[in-house]
């Protein structure tokens, strides 16, 4: 019957499952913003065992759905939002990593609705609770993690809108939910809050207040967070005034490029999320492209690249990424197409993905791409992320170190001891 293939289901929703786990905090690792409490980084002196503090901003932040606990399936929602801060232990504020979490996504009224998400239970399309992870680039105890001594602001994801939504959807049930066998999930009358923009804005505002004059600012993201990092790139560069201050500014986008069907191009999704208004998060010229339903992913991100031409970009992807292929099918067919028997092939994904990234390289010499053979999804949240090899047998850790060590006048004609850098006219492909 429908939804009978557990293996396919696990692959389809892996982005929502593997990228989140419950935080292990205690009272000493929490700070709540208020009129009398700014949670200044200097005051965060009692971090939890992983070196982090959870900051609860309150205000207009929240996750997608009101609080709910399903006693049958264990499906949980919680409206409360927080972000996670890893301060440098010596209060050295020269380096800051802002990282947008992944965790699935929704695409339309069917897939964004509470009834379907609850009925899917452990296979929900996106995370509905703010969560954290301690692995990969945010692991303070991983010896070869090049970010272990950076200040890190980790932006959790619980809204299904690639961090940029600004819209409330009324309760909706299409009838498909009834086929999933969880009638207790139906008729709850819960709206869906696409609140990613406000959540991101709260984390970014706190980060700017506490790290206003960094020398090196990297904005990263994995899966849905990869798109969040890309979409917020110009906005963050303006917030930190990187051009005037000479800040080295970089975007590290892991495992989502934005290969989408012509029938529902990126601006259509962004408009659905309520993300195309000027300043949320796009500058005016990009917002205009965003509002054009016929524009492509390439046109939107190219405009962001050209808006801040000194930004350094690193795109990390596997050539056959299974989640990117399934999300393409979900956007094209909605939930009615499940279990998506005719997925885009790995070869077609790579061809489309590389065409997009080559277009970016044509407008900027600061685009580096790192391709891994296979279908793996997300690298930077893995405990062994530095050891992944590219299709040219280069280690991801070596590539990131080279990428970070280059100054703002990066000369792409140079050849390092370990990494061959491509000609200036074509960006860098590793």
Where are these regions (language model features)?
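A positional/structural detector of protein chain ends, strongest at the extreme C-terminus
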Residues: 1-4, 428-430
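Cleavable N-terminal signal peptides of Sec/SRP-targeted secreted and luminal proteins
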Residues: 4-22, 27
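C-terminal His-loop and adjacent cap/lid subdomain of alpha/beta-hydrolase
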Residues: 23-430
């Amino acid at each position: 019957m429908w939804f009978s293939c557990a293996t396919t289901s696990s692959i389809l929703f892996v982005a929502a499952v593997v990228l989140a786990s419950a935080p292990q905090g205690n009272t000493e690792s929490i700070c709540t913003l208020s009129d009398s409490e700014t949670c200044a980084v200097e005051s965060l002196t009692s971090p939890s065992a992983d070196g982090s503090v959870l900051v609860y901003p309150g205000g207009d932040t929240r996750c997608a759905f009101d609080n709910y606990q399903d006693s049958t399936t264990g499906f949980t929602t919680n409206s409360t939002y927080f972000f996670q801060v890893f301060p440098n232990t010596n209060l050295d504020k020269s380096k800051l990593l802002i990282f947008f979490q992944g965790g699935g996504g929704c695409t339309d009224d069917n897939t964004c609705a509470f009834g379907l998400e609850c009925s899917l239970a452990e296979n929900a399309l996106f995370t509905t609770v703010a969560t954290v992870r301690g692995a990969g680039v945010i692991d303070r105890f991983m010896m070869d993690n090049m970010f272990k001594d950076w200040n890190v602001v980790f932006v959790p994801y619980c809204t299904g809108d690639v961090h940029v939504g600004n819209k409330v959807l009324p309760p909706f049930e299409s009838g498909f939910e009834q086929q999933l066998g969880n009638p207790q999930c139906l008729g709850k009358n819960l709206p869906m809050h696409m609140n990613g923009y406000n959540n991101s804005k709260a984390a970014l505002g706190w980060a700017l207040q506490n790290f206003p004059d960094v020398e090196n600012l990297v904005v990263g993201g994995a899966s849905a967070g990869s798109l969040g990092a890309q979409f917020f790139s110009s906005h963050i560069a303006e917030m930190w005034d990187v051009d005037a201050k000479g800040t080295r500014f970089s975007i590290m986008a892991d495992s989502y490029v934005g290969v989408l069907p012509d029938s529902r191009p990126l601006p259509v999704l962004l408009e659905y999320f309520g993300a195309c208004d000027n300043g949320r998060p796009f500058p005016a010229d990009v917002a205009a492209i965003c509002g054009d339903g016929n524009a492509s992913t390439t046109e939107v991100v190219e405009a962001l690249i050209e808006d801040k031409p000194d930004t350094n970009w690193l795109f990390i992807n596997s050539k056959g990424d299974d989640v990117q292929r399934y999300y393409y099918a979900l956007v094209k067919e909605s939930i009615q197409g499940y279990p998506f028997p005719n997925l885009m092939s790995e070869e077609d994904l790579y061809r489309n993905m590389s065409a997009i990234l080559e277009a970016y390289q044509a407008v900027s010499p600061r685009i580096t791409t790192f391709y891994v053979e296979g279908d793996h999804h997300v690298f930077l949240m893995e405990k062994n992320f530095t050891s992944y090899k590219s299709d040219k047998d280069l280690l991801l850790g070596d590539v990131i170190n080279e990428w970070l060590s280059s100054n703002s006048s990066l000369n792409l004609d140079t050849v390092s001891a370990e990494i061959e850098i491509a000609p200036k006219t074509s960006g860098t492909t590793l």
